[in-house]
A protein has these predicted regions:
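Amphipathic alpha-helical packing segments from all-alpha helical-bundle domains
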Residues: 92, 96-109, 116-142, 149-153, ...
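Key DNA-contact positions within bacterial/archaeal DNA-binding proteins
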Residues: 45
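Short, basic, alpha-helical segments at the C-terminal edge of helix-turn-helix-like DNA-binding modules
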Residues: 33, 62-70
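Basic, helix-initiating cap at the start of DNA-binding domains
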Residues: 1-42, 55-56
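Alpha-helical DNA-contacting segments of helix-turn-helix folds
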Residues: 23, 56-65, 125
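Amphipathic C-terminal alpha-helical segment
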Residues: 135, 152-173, 188-192
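Hydrophobic alpha-helical connector segments
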Residues: 60, 73-103, 126
Length: 192
């Protein structure tokens, strides 16, 4: 009985791994059940035995990916007293993370724009990261009311995957120049 449970767990993990790889390479919307089953080396009925609904698969894949590819830890950023240094470190770590996971992030965010189920599992993760990171970077900055709102918006914009993608991939800036552009934007905001 124990061996059977282990085999089921291994099969389930192969399905999750196959799905994550397909989401990375082609995106959730282009990933078919047949492709997942083939890549995992299982039959379709085996896939459905483990994941009767697509939401079950998305939940397993999201949890698996975040555990094995954790986002940058914002706690060390608050140790930096200088606000620009704090923002610079955050951008450095977040942009490196985006660069490393660019393919899967671009695919899932693209598909989340047109698929409600994909959005349900993707958007809260990215929104939570951005909110947590923005709060950590903004901590201690002298801003209240509308100015604080603008500061959080600017930092959130700077830390957004689409901003990184636009600056680095579409505009051709290297990560250092993209970071300095965002630091300069926030600096200008805080001087007004």
């Amino acid at each position: 009985m124990k061996r059977r449970a282990e085999r089921q767990k291994e099969t389930r993990q192969r399905i999750v791994d196959a799905t994550v790889e397909l989401h990375r390479s082609i995106g959730p919307l282009r990933t078919t059940i047949s492709a997942i089953a083939e890549k995992a080396g299982v039959e379709r009925h085996t896939y459905y035995a483990h994941f009767p609904e697509l939401k079950d698969l998305y939940q397993a894949c999201s949890g698996h990916y975040v555990v094995h590819h954790p986002p940058p830890d914002h706690c060390s950023w608050t140790e930096l007293a200088d606000h620009e240094d704090r923002l610079r470190r955050a951008l450095s770590e977040v942009y490196a993370y985006y660069g490393h996971h660019e393919e899967i992030f671009a695919n899932v965010l693209r598909d989340a724009q047109v698929d409600a189920l994909c959005a349900k599992f993707t958007n809260p993760v990215f929104q939570n990261w951005k909110r947590t990171w923005s709060d950590a970077v903004a901590e201690g900055w002298d801003a209240e009311g509308e100015r604080d709102e603008a500061l959080l918006a600017a930092i959130g914009f700077a830390l957004d995957f689409q901003t990184w993608n636009t600056l680095v991939r579409q505009q051709g800036l290297d990560q250092e120049r993209a970071m300095e552009l965002m630091v300069g934007m926030v600096r200008c905001l805080m001087r007004t």
